[in-house]
Amino acid sequence: MIFQSFLLGNLVSLCMKIINSVVVVGLYYGFLTTFSIGPSYLFLLRALVMEEGTEKKVSATTGFITGQLMMFISIYYAPLHLALGRPHTITVLALPYLLFHFFWNNHKHFFDYGSTTRNSMRNLSIQCVFLNNLIFQLFNHFILPSSMLARLVNIYLFRCNNKILFVTSGFVGWLIGHILFMKWLGLVLVWIRQNHSIRSNKYIRSNKYLVLELRNSMARIFSILLFITCVYYLGRIPSPILTKKLKEASKTEERVESEEERDVEIETASEMKGTKQEQEGSTEEDPYPSPSLFSEEGWDPDKIDETEEIRVNGKDKIKDKFHSHLTETGYNNINTSNSPIYDYQDSYLNNNNTGNLENFKLQLLDKKNENQDLFWFQKPLVSLLFDYNRWNRPFRYIKNNRFEQAVRTEMSQYFFDTCKSDGKQRISFTYPPSLSTFWKMIKRKIPLLSLQKTLPNKLDTQWVSTNKEKSNNLNKEFLNRLEILDKESLSMDILETRTRLCNDDTKKEYVPKMYDPLLNGPYRGTIKKGVSSSIINNTLLENWEKRVRLNRIHTIFLPNIDYQEFEQKAYTIDKKPLSTEIDEFLTLINELGNEPKSSLNVKGLSLFSDQEQRRAKSENRTKFVKFVFNAIDPNEPKSGKKSIGIKEISKKVPRWSHKLITELDQQMGEFQDRASIDHQLRSRKAKRVVIFTDNNATNDPEEEVALISYSQQSDFRRGIIKGSMRAQRRKTFISKLFQANVHSPLFVDRITPLRLFSFDISELIKPIFRNWTGKEREFKILESREEQTKREEKKEKDKKEDNKRKEQARIAIEEAWDNIPFAQIIRGYMLITQSILRKYILLPSLIIAKNLGRMLFLQLPEWSEDLQEWNREMQIKCTYNGVQLSETEFPKDWLRDGIQIKILFPFCLKPWHISKLYPSRGELMKKKKQKDDFCFLTVWGMEAELPFGSPRKRPSFFEPIFKELEKKIGKFKKKYFLTLKILKGKTKLFRSVSKETKKWFIQSIGFLKKIKKELSKVNPIVLFRFKEISESNETKKEKDYLISNQIINESFSQIESGNWPNSSLIEKKMKDLTDRTSTIKNQIERITKEKKKVTPEIDINPNKTNNIKKLESPKKFFQILKSRNTRVIWKFHYFLKLFIQRLYIDLFLSIINIPRITTQLFLESTNKLIEKFISNNEINQEKITNKKKIHFIFISTIKKSLYNISKKNSHIFCDLSYLSQAYVFYKLSQTQVINLSKFRSVLQYNTTSCFLKTKIKDYFKKLGIFHSELKHKKLQSYRINQWKNWLRWHYQYDLSQIRWSRLMPKKWRTRVNQSCMAQNKNRNLNKWNSYEKDQLIHYKKENDSELYSLSNQKDNFKKCYRYGLLAYKSINYENKSDSFFSRLPFQVKKNLEISYNSNTSKHNFVDMPVNLHINNYLRKVNILDIERNLDRKYFDWKIIHFSLRQKGDIEAWVKIDTNSNPNTKIGINNYQIIDKIEKKGVFYLTTHQNPEKTQKNSKKVFFDWMGMNEKIFNRPILNLEFWFFPEFVLLYNVYKIKPWIIPSKFLLFNLNTNENVIQNKNQKQNFFLPSNKKIKNRSQETKEPPSQRERGSDIENKGNLSPVFSKHQTDLEKDYVESDTKKGQNKKQYKSNTEAELDLFLKRYLLFQLRWNDALNQRMLENIKVYCLLLRLINPTKITISSIQRREMSLDIMLIQANLPLTDLMKKGVLIIEPIRLSVKHNGQFIMYQTIGISLVHKSKHQTNQRYREQRYVDKKNFDEFILQPQTQRINTEKTHFDLLVPENILWSRRRRELRIRSFFNSLNWNVVDRNSVFCNETNVKNWSQFLGERKPLYKDKNELIKFKFFLWPNYRLEDLACMNRYWFDTNNGSRFSILRIHMYPRLKIN
């Protein structure tokens, strides 16, 4: 068995090796290329099908295979690839050959290729067949691209090691595939020839010469097919000759721009990040070859060829292009356009020898004048055809306002080149481009063999050995520190600290980092961000010298003067430490100096004269070495680099020499100097709509008021240069008129999902179930308010979507008219025609017809009324967008731009006019509901509400006529049936009348019945109405029925009996029979009626001819009842079944409703208790202060008021879930008698304790509500290994992907990390009770410093500690009850610190803020203060503004942990522990309206219980202002501009903060004040501002803004006066201090934009249209009044003045401030802090943590005294190692980084198995005991150690990650990381 499995395993491994081998993969890829059929197959197919003789077939096959073999060889052999891939040669070969081939096949008589006696291989036709197949196989990849083979081969070739073997096997696979293909083709052809059915076809037999003609014309058919195919393929590639050329910018412009742009350097990370995404097509590579050009990765033959051509053409090419290169690379700031290079160098030499600059200038100008008249044909042909500087590629023009010339988009962000690292050749992405260029020039000059000889490998071995030694030393030091720690010595000796120079040891003032010699890294110099104007405007001489020195190497090492490449690559050498290639170069220079002869080929320098060459030869070696070093040494002072500091690594960005203007620029006339030039950029379709022209002035376009109207159609051409190549995107299409992106048809079903079965089943079942059960009341309870609001929201949403759909259809029609050529002309004429037809033909003819009709019907005509309405109708000409002009004026260029015709007061034909003296109330209501009385004329003469809208329904002319007719017919029917009724009642009188009279009467009744029947068909409703009005007397009704029935029977018998001769006997029998049947019928009917009435009566009919007088005997009656009973018994089973079902349904519904009803009762009782408490409070309040009451606003009223404020914020759910448990139980506890017995059973339920807050449980336990044995239960946790699931464990993180994407990352990170930075005090148990003392110290420290520095010396240490804690918690979260680390940096607690000692109470573990919903981040909540703290960096409670609506969102305030603080008493007077004392109230950063009055008061209340009392005397500034502008809250992200300097308190602009601090310093602080005392003290405090009292009413009144703002301004005025007088500063005087505050807010900190309100936007546009109309009218009063009546013009917007300040606009709701989400360029440190996610903190935030490191590492023997042992929980007897989770923390951060890099990147074993061997083997866990040297391990399960991952976050490799993100991550810019490669922490090794 073992042997078999061994054999099987070997077999499997052997098969895997064979499958993965290079040969098999090559064969597979080669075989695949068989299916890559291109145009080259046409010749092979033609030869196999049509050619006669084996020679031609053999030659075709040979040529085909030879061409493919050349292609495979060219993949590996670069020169052949260059030769084949050069577009010039291929073009030169292909175009004449195609012409020749076409000519050959169509004019064969020019060539005699008949059979000769010579050798057949010399036959021209056979050679042509060979050439056809060979050349077109080569064409297939370049002119006629087939991408499958190239992609597959290149992808694998890049990965493959043995490239020759792969290419060979690929060719063999291709050969096998094609042999099989040709064999199969031959078999098919033989089968066709031999198939009898094909040959015996009737059509073929009838046309004898059909096959012959087909064979003769096959050559032409193939040539036509080939031509069509070539045109199709070439259509994707723009012809280089036919491409639209662009004119270069004028010389003066270039000179100015070159001066402006010379020293400008753009950081590639920010400026170039979007360029890669803008490139499209398949040929948009870099035209400048990179140093890794001949590697197999992504190079293009086109760009190589451009480079080669420039080399070949040498001097002439450089003449014309040198100026543009100087301009692009920034070397030129004099007018050197078209200056030849040899002049440049001659002048340089002369200038070097003589120093005479003027001679140089004169020489330049002379040479320029000489060359001005040179003709264009001096340029070579290739330069004319293929100019790399032309826009003949699919580039979009990225316009930069600072630099008018565009950046060349094909330049890369990074520079890649190979260098040696650790003795291995590696690709570096931050290689200095200048060094690469220089090294390339040296390699060209010196043979490769000599370079290899002169570069020994000693440096590499030395480099590796030193690195190993350093790594070993670091590991030893690390382990030594760990051993000392195991020996339980003092921990402060173990920690590695950073040494810094200190000015004052007591104050801990350090030397600035920039001047600290003990620091290294980026602090040692300033970073030069840009170049000042003074440096730019240096003298000509200095710039010239600088440029000359930069070009020294160029003059020495460049044989062919490839200026095009050099000017792009010769950047200034970067300030990075030089890599190993510099060292290699230095050794090379030394060897050159020691040689007797220089190995440089100086004779090859073509630009030197002989005299100069001799002088160069005679130079001394030392001079040569100095000369080279002067040229390349970046630190030489003579090189013109006078600025001190570190220059950032950046590239000179090349620019195009063209200035391109868009179509819109040309229309707007912005570039008047280039008005004659046609636009070169395609812009978005737009129209310039002139809405007003000042006719009095000249025709200056500035006197016109114009709007730009953009087309909303999908336009994927915009931004593309005219004549540029389009993208070679196949399989893409545009399916909609408005489409954001181009989609592939493969994914159409995913884009538009099928909605056939997507319906809500519950919505369908609910009405059926409701009707079945008939229980409406229960369903009313079941359907809560939420469902009602949801339904209403759904209706509103559907309505909005419907309107949106209609709007899109309208826009689609508008765009369609725009796109169709000549459509506007046709439409304009049609509209004018329809307007004339309507006004002068159609409407007058209708008026005439109507009045003639009235005259025919003998009614008065209404000529005057109709003509008056007809005259009232106005047809106003409007622009295409609906801007009104006048009745007579036509828009400018209306035939081209389009026209609209707006009809004011449209005429509607009415059948009659109602007198207007006394209009009825219904008409008045109709007028109110009526829409605006205007419409737009459509092309078909219809009326539409909006331009291009759907035609509206016009009121019908005949509808009121029909209604009137119906009324009259109804009246007639009523009268008619009343007469019928009277006649029917009097039929009794006709009993004694003779039979003849009866007969006549019966006939008349029959006739009337027919009429009645017909009328009932016409209008049955009226008939039934009259039927219901019947006699009330039932017996009378029954008698009448019997009488009429008997009359009918008698008539029946008489009519029938008239036909018999002896009718007396028969007549009597039939009479008896009819009597009997009628009696039975009457009995049945009477019984049914009696059953209904339950009053049995026996009706004795006297009109019987037989002797039976009493048929209704009881016996008969009981028989009928018996039959009924049998029927009931038969159906009893079904009755029972139905009854049981109904019973079940009732029970089921009642069970469902029980929890709903109980919760409702509970909430109602809670509400009553709360309201009772509030009413008591308010009664007391009124007794003390006679002020207006504020009613408690419960959640429902909040919801209602918010709904009234704005229906736009329909996603606000003020649900009862927002009420925290703390709030509810606090209100319950405040009742006079605590009677919670009714809740005892609920609270004692087993699962309840899992969901109640811990401190609430403790509180109720003391009250005796909870059982004492009920412990703090935790929900069961499951072992999940992954980080995602750990996050998902906290429900706040468990969101859908869409909602995650809507989160603002910075806000969420900010909120999450607020608790991480909390103060770290109260370490000792002895200091646990000294709250006030510590708070006062902390309070003073915080207020002493104005601006905080970036960080103190412990910031990084604490940051790394928290970082390690987070990493640990992600692994060991399951054992939360056993490990000490019960608090995580993700928690947000009541401003308690993250306790680093051992507070082991279970309830503190990961106590996520249950009610701080993540919804806060997903929407802008319109509640007063709900989002006040969202953008704070820290969870700083001093700036949280509590209000009524916020209590439901913050639950952390009632966490009174008796276990952790035994001295805290839970009573009425001690509600809350406050561990931070702030000025002006803990929760309210207030504006003291009267600081002097505040100073007089002896007491200052800092805190009312959780802010729950309804009136708080000091309201914050922002509490008023942001109520109306919730968008302001988003602006608190101050990190966008000044991230680390501005402290939190300065963001709130309370300018008198310091004064208030001084006033309040010596006052008694009342910390724990109950609500009753608070009420008493309130009378002594500052008066409450009216804005707080009026807040509730303001909400319901939809925000009455003015009183609040006016009061707010008065408050602020006092504040500003106070601050101005005390500080003595001269401030800008504002009209309103709100404006001053706003100005400070906007000017100093934030990027912002002013956005119109949505509702205002539409109103403003309507106003603009009306204004445009009024400006043109002579007497605009009438139109103005009618516009106001029709609500077209909004008067509140009309009142906006020109000088209205910003605050007034905001008060009116006109403008809303919102931030601009711009990418702001940050320095590297800021990006690092952002990426880490646990950011640095302000200095003041950690000043209370001075004891941090002294108390953190204490002696382990005394460790237990720091462990807090709770009263009711188990005592933690285990000693806790709280810092040994992350052993690296012993080292300092810089050394830690070094340890990680060395241990990871220097790892010799790079395989996954070797790397993770520590963790994959359980037995190796004991090796970690050196870190955790304990008798008892901290962990329960050793396997958890396997999950001990240490993340390689980019805080130490940020620059590498930012550069490598294009390869490691799926992003194109360095601003975000989509994924990080996380590696296991490697095992420490000591060699």
From Swiss-Prot:
Q: Where in the cell is the protein located?
A: Plastid, Chloroplast inner membrane
Task: Report biased composition (Basic and acidic residues) as residue ranges.
Answer: 1578-1597
Task: Say where the protein is mainly found.
Answer: plastid
Tell me the GO BP annotations in alphabetical order: protein transport
Q: What PANTHER family does this protein's entry cite?
A: PROTEIN TIC 214-RELATED, TRANSLOCON AT THE INNER ENVELOPE MEMBRANE OF CHLOROPLASTS 214
Q: What is this protein called?
A: Protein TIC 214
Q: What family does the Swiss-Prot or TrEMBL record give for this protein?
A: Belongs to the TIC214 family.
Give me the gene this protein comes from: TIC214
Q: Which GO terms describe its cellular component?
A: chloroplast inner membrane
Spans annotated as Disordered? 248-300, 786-805, 1569-1603
What is the originating organism of this protein? Solanum bulbocastanum
